[in-house]
Amino acid sequence: VVLTVVLALATADLHQQEVRQRFQLLVNERYSRLEERFEDQEQRLGSLRRFFVNSNTVSREEFDGFAQPLLMRARAYAWAPRIFRDQRQAFEQQVSLQRGAPFSIRELNDNGTLLPAGERDEYVPVLYSQTQSLIGSPLGFDLLAQPLRRSTVERAYRSGSIAVSQPMLLVGVEPAYAMGVLLVAPVTRPHTAQMTYNEPYGFVMAVISMRQLVADGLPKPARDNLVMQIVDTSDTQQRVLYESDNAVADSGLEAIRRLTLGDHVYALSLRPSQVFAQANHSAVTSILVMGCLLSLLLSALLYVLVSQRQRAVRLVQQRTGQLHQREYELRGAHGQLRSVLNAATQVAI
């Protein structure tokens, strides 16, 4: 039993080490994949931004031709120019003429319906859009009409680099992919010797669904070894950007990694799922059961051996007693025979 307990403890320790190693391998692989995807989205938006920077003008056909190949794990790419109050009417008329259909700068009302935008000093309406969505593009939607989008545009304007929105419900996206973020990058004219700084004249944008970006290509929840959660640490409310819906295993294992996208930092939390726990169950219980059974068998064997030895000793003692009795009887008979012989000898003499 003691040997069984020692063996079980050693096996349990070895099993824990192996489980931790397997978990770390899965964590490293998942983290590397997500980090690569996040960096890839920044690079794709950066290439679209450079396309505008290096072009005097970009037509809708040119935009579609360049943006369509970029649509990998992104719901849409869009171009939104800056339009001021006194430019609005002429801009809407020009775009309506180019499209051959009415166009207006729009905003969402309280019911989520797009309506003509109210008067403001500045607008950033979506003019071009290349999307995977079957719903279509919300052309004319003003990014400055809603606080979360306005904040993202303003941060991109101030920093001159890619800004990422807080988690939000995306416009023009199927409900299954509606939760996500916007990546916004400012577009300026190339610097010249006379003008080293130019204000952005518009913004390129990537519409990112977290479900598509994170879960695409990964195992189904019922077969995934890891439970994932991505939290926006740049947000004071620590909002959850993505959370898988598979069951968490009863384990103390957890790994937290840092992911960056634009100007936001995310905490990636990874824990083992029940699928992982079932595939890596411990053999300690089996060892204890087998050890106990083996101990019982050895005890039974030892009992049988001892019983047989005691029986053999008793048989030997019994046989020895019988031999001693026989020897005593033979000695008595021998004495009697000698007495008879002696008497016969005397008579003969």
Show the residue positions of the predicted features.
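Juxtamembrane interface at the cytosolic side of transmembrane helices
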Residues: 299-321
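Membrane-proximal amphipathic alpha-helices
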Residues: 9-45, 52-60
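PAS/LOV and related PAS-like sensory modules
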Residues: 323-349
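Short hydrophobic secondary-structure edge segments in sensory/regulatory modules of signaling proteins
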Residues: 45, 77, 348-349
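Intrinsically disordered, low-complexity polar/acidic regions
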Residues: 20, 24-28, 53-270
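Membrane-interface helix-start motif
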Residues: 271-291
